[in-house]
């Protein structure tokens, strides 16, 4: 069963209102912004502080995305089916029933505790002729780490790229908020 829905169906008005309300600046809550958006693509930047040093934050991001990824944003509906092989050429993959699988992205740069970069067109972007680069940068902070997600997507969109950028920003901001809550809950 394919649970990834078209971008337009990802958020209802109440869900969007809740997402906006939850995005108020709080410790450990992800704050995201569409920093550039045109008909040909967009760039998102999402930042979060976590209570773990960069090496541990990187490990939590890469070893178990199932622990923090929202299952609503998987094809199988089960986050535990996600794996991330955090080395160059490694797959951010999902297994499904009947032997089916999906590659959500390929690792193109891995430097534990510093940077993880994937080539990826996430969710509904996968079926469009677009190219995406998703980077996670880790910087030490006195109380842990500052993690910055940058997602650049460009190409031939089959839907309005400006509208899609807002939906993708909302979903990835939610994911980073879940990541921060997961890491911060490991005190």
Residue ranges and their predicted role:
Residues 54, 61-65, 69, 88, ...:
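Sec/Tat-exported extracytoplasmic proteins
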Residues 3, 31, 146, 150-187:
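A conserved amphipathic terminal alpha-helix motif
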């Amino acid at each position: 069963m394919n649970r990834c829905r078209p971008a337009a169906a990802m958020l209802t008005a109440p869900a969007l209102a809740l997402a906006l309300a939850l995005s108020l600046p709080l410790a450990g809550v992800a704050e995201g912004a569409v920093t550039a958006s045109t008909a040909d693509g967009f760039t998102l930047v999402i930042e979060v502080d976590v209570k773990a040093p960069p090496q541990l934050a990187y490990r939590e991001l890469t070893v178990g995305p199932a622990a923090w990824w929202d299952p609503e944003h998987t094809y199988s509906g089960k986050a535990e089916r996600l794996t991330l092989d955090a080395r160059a050429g490694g797959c951010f993959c999902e297994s499904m029933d009947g032997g089916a699988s999906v590659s959500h992205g390929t690792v193109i740069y891995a430097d534990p505790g510093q940077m993880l970069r994937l080539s990826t067109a996430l969710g509904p972007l996968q079926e469009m002729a677009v190219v995406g680069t998703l980077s996670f940068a880790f910087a030490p902070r006195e109380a842990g780490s500052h993690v910055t997600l940058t997602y650049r997507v460009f190409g031939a969109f089959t839907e309005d790229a400006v509208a899609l950028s807002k939906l993708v920003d909302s979903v990835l901001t939610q994911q980073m908020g879940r990541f921060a809550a997961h890491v911060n809950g490991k005190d």
